[in-house]
Regions:
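Sec-dependent N-terminal signal peptides of Gram-positive bacterial secreted proteins and lipoproteins
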Residues: 4-28
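Acidic, divalent-cation-chelating loop motifs in proteins
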Residues: 90-98
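Acidic/hydrophobic-patterned starts of short beta strands in beta-sheet-rich repeat architectures
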Residues: 97-107, 147-151
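Structural motif
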Residues: 111-117
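Short aromatic loop motif centered on NTY/YTY
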Residues: 126-152, 157, 164
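Noncatalytic, helix-rich "gating/capping" subdomain that lines the substrate-entry/channel surface
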Residues: 201-501, 537
């Protein structure tokens, strides 16, 4: 029996079909220097032969508490087969459709190849070759040979051994870490960058240690926590706090009365029929604008409404109906009356949901429009009065869905008054049930859940609310955190690293041969205007607008906080944006307790947030080289994103200047073309990399992040020139430690589509681009870590 064989990379001149077994717990070791066998010339066909003795029958895979799955057994066996030996390759591909890959091990032999094919046998937990297992091998991608093996996969390091820094720098530097076990299941991953976050523990201490931590901001958080968990008082209040809002809405008998109700935040804390969000116009970031989104209190999200069938939508709305019915019947309505109100509310809500969706006009937005122009476009709906009630009487508005406001305006008539009233009352009820008494809060809980279990749930939820930067107490929480935990010395040191990075990059820009004088001037203008926001602003935002009156009910406290936040944010509409201003009140994603360090093009600001900092990424005890390798690498990486094809769309003031006709923004076209020519080399390099067996990396997808990694090291090498005695070994080893991680095979293979290269490539493929690395470790052409100068891929 002869079978046709096709390969993606190179033709198979000679193959020998081999039989053998490998075991997850066998005790035999592969010979690292396999002797070559005589070549059996079968051209491009695969034939059955007797097993060859140089391919071991079993491969030993360490066994521990972690249970390897079939795919991992195949992968780790392939690692053993090819090891760090040249001319050995392996691949995995599911040929028979059983969702378990077959393992192909190929060895160069003379002018041809010898190949062993193993299949997994679940009865033995072994990979066993059957002679007729291979029917068609299409587009196989072979790993191994001169490429590094992905040693982040659990078990790979132990099998490969420590190859030395000249052969696999990532594996060698991190060998002890990688050879240990840090994950417990096949869905796990362990990354010290992700494990660094101490923020939650710090915030818990801040809340709970009342004698140690005191002040205005922390008191706001504790007042909210105490009232939220005072169940005696909440039970005594019952649903009385919400009844005044329901009764007020029930007495609306005309559109003119509805106008007044909607404009008064004291009477109407919930329903405006749109959600105002403070933001910036990407084409003119000089002032804050207001974005009008769809109503945030809808019973179902627009994307679900537009992509689900009627039964699914009905099921999703069940919770809304249960909660609304519970509150409204306790307020004195009958179930029949509530059912009618819900039905009427859906008439209005469905019409608005239909309009809350992109159309051709939203694909080509007109940009921000002056407030008075938008208000004038409404013939019926009192948009101007509602906005004035929120403190908005100047500036510009951005409409997300072009059809939404016209539909709302068209429906706002006396004829539909009952629908509007029903919508308001049912939505008030639904938005309130969690902030009243125990009976209301449990209305959506299972019948067997005890009161104590629900109270514990509320306690946990309250902690989440008061410890989150995006919650209604976010500003007070961030102020308290920065007051107690941001170290001024750390801020000073990290600011110095940012300044060193910017200074070095400026020097590189001036020296770049591919940049024209015009391009250099534009790049330097943007870099010089870039503001670095490190750990905390010099002045905290006043949180007085969040002050709590503890004599109020918990419900009233929640309602007042909700309105105070809304009015505080909306009041910024039309205000000039101050370059470098750190508005964590308006943009919670830049709150310092967020786990991030990144460049924001619309603000032309670089943020190093405290949530990203830990003893692993930064401490004052680190040598400067280690600081530069860890936080410096990240800062340099992110900074250069401001000058990549996405970053060049935004000018020095954060305005988007790129157009369809001029996608290169502020960069001269010739410079952009030169940049992309260099980028194509980066892309081509990663196209050749086989990250995991049978799945090659995508250079087109990963070149941007890879280029930023390389640029970060380029900047560090520039900085090193000004530091006599710079310890390059410390720098490169520290950078390898930064990216060390451990993955299950299935978890790692899932990252093949990520825009970032695998972590072992972020070390090996990046370090190998630099003369300083070659010289530090005495690399030559015989070492895997050596890349000839003419093949190196740097942009900056």
């Amino acid at each position: 029996m002869k079978k046709s064989v096709k390969r993606m990379i190179g033709g198979i001149c000679a193959l020998s079909m081999l039989t053998g077994t490998l075991s997850a717990c066998g005790k035999s070791n592969a010979d690292p220097d396999m002797p070559e066998e005589p070549v059996v010339d079968v051209s491009t066909e695969l034939q059955e032969t007797e097993p060859q003795k140089d391919f071991p029958e079993t491969y030993e895979i360490p066994v521990g508490s972690y249970a390897y799955d079939p795919e991992e057994i195949m992968f780790l066996s392939g690692v053993t087969a090819c090891g760090m030996q040249k001319d050995m390759f392996f691949s995995m591909k599911d040929l028979d459709g059983d969702m378990i890959s077959e393992l192909f091990v190929m060895k160069k032999s003379g002018d041809g190849d010898e190949i062993a094919v193993y299949s997994y046998d679940n009865t033995q937990n072994k990979a066993v070759l059957t002679k007729d297992a291979v029917y068609d091998i299409n587009e196989l991608v072979w790993a191994g040979g001169d490429q590094w093996i992905d040693s982040t996969v659990l078990g790979a390091a132990g099998i490969l051994g420590n190859p030395g820094v000249k052969e696999d720098f990532y594996l060698s530097v991190n060998y002890d870490f990688l050879a240990d076990t840090h994950i417990n299941t096949q869905g796990d991953e362990f990354n010290e960058l992700d494990m660094k976050n101490m923020i939650e523990e710090q915030k818990l201490s801040m809340i709970n240690e009342r004698d140690k931590y005191q002040g205005k901001d922390i008191q706001i958080l504790r007042d909210y926590q105490d009232v939220a968990n005072d169940w005696d008082r909440r039970s005594a209040d019952g649903i009385e706090p919400v009844k005044k809002y329901l009764e007020d809405a029930a007495n609306i008998n005309s559109i003119s009365e509805l106008d007044k109700f909607l404009a008064d935040t004291g009477r109407n804390p919930f329903c405006r029929f749109f959600n105002p969000v403070i933001t910036l116009d990407e084409e003119d970031t000089s002032e804050w604008i207001l974005e009008l989104d769809e109503d945030a209190t809808f019973s179902v999200l627009p994307r679900i409404f537009h992509n689900s069938d009627t039964e699914d939508i009905k099921e999703i709305r069940a919770d809304y109906e249960i909660a609304a019915t519970h509150i409204l019947t306790r307020a004195g309505l009958t179930e029949e009356e509530v059912a009618k109100m819900i039905e009427e509310s859906y008439v209005l809500e469905d019409a608005l949901l239909e309009a809350a969706w992109p159309n051709e006009e939203s694909d080509n937005p007109v940009g921000a429009i002056p407030v008075d122009e938008v208000c004038a476009s409404c013939s019926n709906f009192p948009l101007e009065a509602v906005l004035n009630g929120l403190g908005v009487n100047k500036g510009k508005l951005n409409i997300i869905y072009p059809d939404y406001l016209p539909v709302l305006d068209e429906m706002y008539t006396e004829e539909n008054l009952s629908c509007f009233r029903s919508y308001i009352m049912t939505h008030i009820a639904y938005m309130s049930y969690e902030y009243l008494d125990l009976e209301a809060g449990k209305c959506l809980m299972s019948a067997d859940e005890t009161d104590e279990e629900y109270k514990e749930y509320v306690k946990d939820r309250t902690y989440t609310e008061i410890m989150g930067s995006r919650g209604i107490l976010g500003v007070a929480e961030e102020n308290a955190y920065m007051t107690y935990y941001v170290d001024p010395k750390a801020k000073e040191t990290l600011t110095m690293i940012c300044e060193d990075t910017a200074e070095a990059f400026a020097a590189m820009i001036k020296e770049e041969e591919w940049l024209s004088e015009e391009g250099k001037a534009a790049a330097l203008e943007k870099l010089n205007k870039m503001k670095f926001c490190v750990l905390s602003p010099d002045e905290l935002i006043d949180s007085s607008y969040l002050a709590i009156d503890t004599s109020d009910s918990f419900y009233d406290i929640y309602v007042k906080l909700r309105v105070s936040n809304l009015k505080h944010n909306c009041a910024a509409t039309g205000e000039k944006r101050v370059p470098g201003e750190w508005r964590y009140d308006l943009r919670p994603e830049i709150a310092t307790s967020v786990d991030n360090a990144y460049y924001n093009g619309s603000l032309n600001q670089f943020f190093v947030l405290a949530g990203f900092i830990s003893d692993f990424t930064f401490s004052d005890d680190m040598p400067y080289e280690e600081m530069l390798a860890k936080m410096g690498s990240i800062i340099g990486h992110e900074l250069t994103h401001g000058f990549d094809p996405n970053g060049i769309q935004y000018d020095a003031d954060g305005n988007k200047v790129a157009t369809d006709d001029k996608p290169y923004g502020w960069m001269p076209e010739a410079d952009y073309n030169a940049y992309m020519e260099k980028a194509e080399k980066v892309s081509a390099y990663f196209d050749k990399v086989v990250g995991v067996p049978y799945m090659a990396c995508s250079g087109e997808q990963q070149w941007g992040e890879a280029s930023a990694d390389i640029a970060g090291v380029s900047i560090a090498m520039k900085i090193a020139q000004d530091h006599p005695g710079f310890d390059y070994d410390c720098y490169f080893r520290s950078r390898a430690e930064l990216w060390r991680e451990q993955m299950s095979f299935i978890r790692e293979s899932g990252y093949i589509t990520d825009a970032h290269p695998f972590n072992y490539l972020r070390v090996n493929a990046v370090n190998a681009q630099f003369d300083e690395f070659v010289q530090t470790y005495g690399l030559s052409e015989d070492n895997r870590m050596y890349i000839p100068p003419e093949e190196r891929i740097t942009i900056w």
